[in-house]
Design a protein with these regions (language model features):
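Low-complexity basic/metal-binding stretches
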Residues: 136-146, 151-152
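A glycine-rich beta-to-alpha transition motif near the start of alpha/beta enzyme domains, typified by
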Residues: 1-133, 140
Length: 153
């Protein structure tokens, strides 16, 4: 199995995740492993798997995507997998969970307002901790621009 022996169960605004730190790129999960771990009856159970790693260790990223992480000062990458094992571009609740996880692992600042730049398949996201609400964390996640469409009758 290409998953470390120790993982963390994380929750964020109604979603639950399995998270782990992979600082040297040794633990890239297979789709089957993700499905097994996320299975609510036979595994740990989760909406998805969050692997915190360096952008250069994510096999499906192009050189341009890795360069975009470098340009955006994102030392860390959220390699998010859906519970069915498929790759996901982004998950807002996942960014919340992985940021607190990164703080608890000592790879992100816990200073209130200090930006944590996180690479995702949807680009670099800048998250800012708003201070702890023990035992939970609080943070600000930019949500991008909303799209609205209207039809005329």
């Amino acid at each position: 199995m290409s998953i470390p022996k120790s993982v963390t169960k994380a929750h964020a605004t109604g979603n639950d995740f399995i998270a782990y730190l992979d600082s040297d790129g040794r633990f890239e999960p297979t789709a089957d492993e993700v499905r097994q771990l996320c299975d609510r009856h036979f595994g740990i159970g989760a909406d998805g798997l969050l692997r915190l790693t360096k952008p250069q260790y994510v096999a499906d990223l192009s050189e341009a995507q890795v360069a975009a992480c470098d340009d955006g000062d994102a030392e860390w990458f959220m390699d998010y997998r859906n519970a069915d094992g498929s790759l996901a571009e982004m998950c807002g609740n996942g960014t919340r969970a992985i940021t607190l996880f990164a703080q608890r692992c000592g790879v992100a600042s816990t200073q209130v307002g200090e930006p944590f730049r996180l690479g995702t398949r949807a680009g670099v996201k800048t998250l800012r901790p708003l201070g702890d609400v023990a035992p939970y964390g609080r943070g600000c996640v930019p949500r991008g621009h909303g799209l609205m469409a209207a039809r005329r009758p």
